[in-house]
Curated annotation (Swiss-Prot):
Protein species of origin: Staphylococcus aureus (strain JH9)
Keyword Chaperone among UniProt keywords: yes
InterPro entries, A to Z: Heat_shock_Hsp33, Heat_shock_Hsp33_C, Heat_shock_Hsp33_N
The UniProt record lists the keyword Endoplasmic reticulum: no
Lineage of source species: Bacteria, Bacillati, Bacillota, Bacilli, Bacillales
Name the record gives this protein: 33 kDa chaperonin
Stored Pfam families: HSP33
Length: 293
């Protein structure tokens, strides 16, 4: 059980909806599994944090997949999450790292690139999917998710994401927030929010200082204005299994399976999301062939 969690809140009498997350241990689990280098860890961790909070907006068995592809050296960052606080992610090139940028921070923009898009696919059940996309405008990811909400979901939002990495590549702190303006919000409320966000300390610094998700929202919105509705745990969780990969092998067709038996006398599958390996014996593949006959 991790100490990570997300809070859902309202502020300014329901004019603002807010989510904040602590994801240090969750991102650490992904870093350990994929052996990401610091810049890749920051990019993956920011994407995981945003995806976990987007998952918290879903209901029941709904889930979503986020693909960040800025055509940069890191390749694609793929994360998915559900409404239960379970999130997983991987990057195409985990050993991506660059010198710090001019601000002395991890150069996420350089790793991600700025020539692609963020694609969000929500599985809302009953074989019904919602898909949205927006161009990458910054490469730092917080601004890119902000832009996604404004253009794809027509929800004025502010997304802040932060990941700090220790010298030994472990994750020192990770977390973030999504603050959304609800229809009918007063101009005065929006102005207060914009001012608070423009003046705030960077998210990763606030988490490093030990601020909880509740503390993060209080810092931005003011303690008197925030009403916490719910708190839910967040963790790295992968739903891969021996059976799921066996079904995937079945989908390759008879000729390919016969080839595996003849050439390799079995098969091995590796999960992109968690790195788990699954081995399939010649006998298992023969049984699979019989089921296709």
């Amino acid at each position: 059980m991790t100490h990570d969690y997300i809070v859902k809140a309202l502020a300014f009498d329901g004019e603002i909806r807010a989510y904040a997350a602590l994801t240090t241990e969750t991102v650490q689990e992904a870093q350990t599994r994929h052996y990401t280098w610091p810049t890749a860890s920051a990019a993956m961790g920011r994407t995981m944090t945003a995806t976990a909070m987007m998952g918290a907006m879903l209901k029941g068995d709904q889930k979503l997949t986020v693909t960040v592809d800025g055509q940069g050296p890191i390749g694609r960052i793929i994360a998915d999450a559900n409404a239960k606080g379970e999130v997983r992610a991987y990057v195409d090139h985990p050993q991506t790292h660059f010198p710090l940028n001019e601000q002395g921070k991890l150069d996420v923009r350089r790793a991600v690139g700025t020539n692609g898009s963020i694609i969000v696919v929500k599985d809302v059940g009953m074989k019904d999917y919602f898909s949205g996309a927006s161009p990458i405008v910054s490469g730092e990811l917080g601004e890119d998710f902000t832009y996604y909400y404004a253009t794809s979901e027509q929800t004025p939002s502010s997304v802040g994401l932060g990941v700090l990495v220790n010298p030994d590549n472990t994750i020192k702190a990770a977390g973030g927030f999504i603050i959304q303006v609800m229809p009918g919000a007063k101009d005065e409320t929006i102005s207060k929010l914009e001012k608070a966000i423009s003046e705030m300390t960077p998210v990763s610094k606030l988490i490093e200082q030990g601020l909880t998700p509740e503390g993060l929202l209080n810092e931005i919105l003011g303690e008197d204005h925030v009403q916490i509705l719910e708190k839910m745990p967040v963790q790295f969780e992968c739903n891969c299994s021996h059976e799921k990969f066996l079904n995937a092998i079945k989908g390759l067709g008879e000729a390919e399976i016969q080839n595996m038996i003849k050439e390799d006398h079995g098969a091995e599958a590796v999960c992109h999301f968690c790195g788990n390996k699954y081995k399939y014996t010649e006998e298992e593949l023969n049984v699979l062939l019989e089921s296709l006959a």
